[in-house]
């Protein structure tokens, strides 16, 4: 993993970054429903397949890998890894696990299952220790569907990476859908970029 610093003065987004990070800090969220009928038909495991899909598209586009380092310098990670939540029914709490990413779907599922087997029953917010800097958060709320979802973060204006939240899937008109909320920072990611991400994710889920 590499973190390549951005030359702000020669960056095509300098004006937008200065405005939405400094002058008028702005994050926003968008909630859509994804068609997962093909996943259901093929009998694929839902959660790891969604993690694979989201991470695949993130790694295609810099705007979803742009972050601040420990010194506040803007840069781009060469690769992102998913850091996702698992639920503990007995305590009604959750833990976070991160998994190494590979473009090979079968290999990623194996990595995911190894981490679930090793850390899935561990309590505490971070079940798998030492998450690397190049992780992004994903969570699942499988008990309800939703048409809108928003996170209110006290220090959210300094967080540039995307945040993903899935809901409960449902059947409608003979197809299966799942809600997805994506929260981004306007300083690095515009509506165009979010819509392109969602289009590419849906295309991937259709394959």
Swiss-Prot record:
Q: Which cysteine pairs make disulfide bonds?
A: none
Question: The organism sits in which domain of life?
Answer: Bacteria
Query: Mind telling me which PROSITE patterns this protein's record contains?
Result: CAT
Q: State whether keyword DNA damage applies.
A: no
Subunit structure of this chain's protein: Homotrimer.
Q: What does this protein do?
A: This enzyme is an effector of chloramphenicol resistance in bacteria.
The name under which this protein is listed is Chloramphenicol acetyltransferase
């Amino acid at each position: 993993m590499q973190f390549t610093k951005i030359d702000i003065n020669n960056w095509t987004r300098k004006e937008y970054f200065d405005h939405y990070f400094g002058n008028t800090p702005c994050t926003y969220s968008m909630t859509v429903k994804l068609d997962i009928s093909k996943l259901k038909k093929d009998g694929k495991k839902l959660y790891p397949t969604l993690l694979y899909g989201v991470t695949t598209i993130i790694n295609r586009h810099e705007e979803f890998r742009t972050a601040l380092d420990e010194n506040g310098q803007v840069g781009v990670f060469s690769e992102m890894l998913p850091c996702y939540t698992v639920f503990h029914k007995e305590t009604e709490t959750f833990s976070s696990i991160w998994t190494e990413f590979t473009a090979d779907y079968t290999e990623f599922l194996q990595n995911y299952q190894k981490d679930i087997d090793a850390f899935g029953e561990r309590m505490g917010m971070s079940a798998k220790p030492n998450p690397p800097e190049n992780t992004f958060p994903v969570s699942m709320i499988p008990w309800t569907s939703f048409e809108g979802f928003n996170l209110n973060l006290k220090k959210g204006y300094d967080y540039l990476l995307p945040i993903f939240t899935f809901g409960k899937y449902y059947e409608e008109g003979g197809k299966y859908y799942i809600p997805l909320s994506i929260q981004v920072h306007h300083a690095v990611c515009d509506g165009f970029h979010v819509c392109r991400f969602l289009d590419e994710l849906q295309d991937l889920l259709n394959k």
